[in-house]
Regions:
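Conserved double-stranded beta-helix
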Residues: 135, 140-144
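Glycine-rich GHKL/ HATPase_c ATP-binding element in histidine kinases
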Residues: 118
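C-terminal structural segments of small proteins and small subunits
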Residues: 121-129
Length: 144
């Protein structure tokens, strides 16, 4: 679902307006700012040319897939809860105010082993910040 707000005198040009946004690669045409996944959700807080900021919420006893990205690096800051982060073959336990860098091409995963939601601020950097820039190695939700 989407909501488009524009002046009344322009309402006959809705299709054209969306096509113009698409031509400009405006992510608002492609992604809603709140996205739900089997493990929880994320909210896109800010998107610029070479960086993006998200708020991730990992539900209790859930984890994201073991994955890597070809085109982006990520920096995670725990703002609520405790995270178990896999980075390559090492596991890091991060509590509130702790952070970790995930360079591109690095296998990684976030897991919430707690009984309350885990909240992380994610800063992505790179030349291509696309949701489909993901190579999954393990996924308990059977996604490719």
């Amino acid at each position: 679902d989407a909501l488009l707000i524009m002046p009344n005198d322009k309402n006959t040009n809705i299709k054209e307006s969306i096509e113009n946004l698409s031509k400009k690669n405006n992510e608002k045409v492609q992604y809603h700012p709140n996205v739900y996944r089997p493990w929880g959700s994320f909210e896109i807080l800010l998107t610029k040319k070479n960086y993006q900021v998200k708020k991730l919420i990992i539900n209790p006893n859930q984890k994201i897939s073991l994955q890597k990205h070809k085109h982006r690096s990520e920096h995670w800051v725990v703002v609520k809860g405790n995270a178990s982060v896999t980075k390559n073959n090492k596991v890091y336990n991060l509590k509130k105010n702790y952070s970790i860098d995930i360079p591109k091409e690095t296998k990684h995963r976030i897991e919430n082993k707690e009984k309350t939601p885990l909240v992380i601020i994610e800063i992505q950097t790179g030349n291509k910040l696309l949701e489909n820039d993901i190579i999954r190695f393990e996924d308990i939700y059977n996604r490719n």
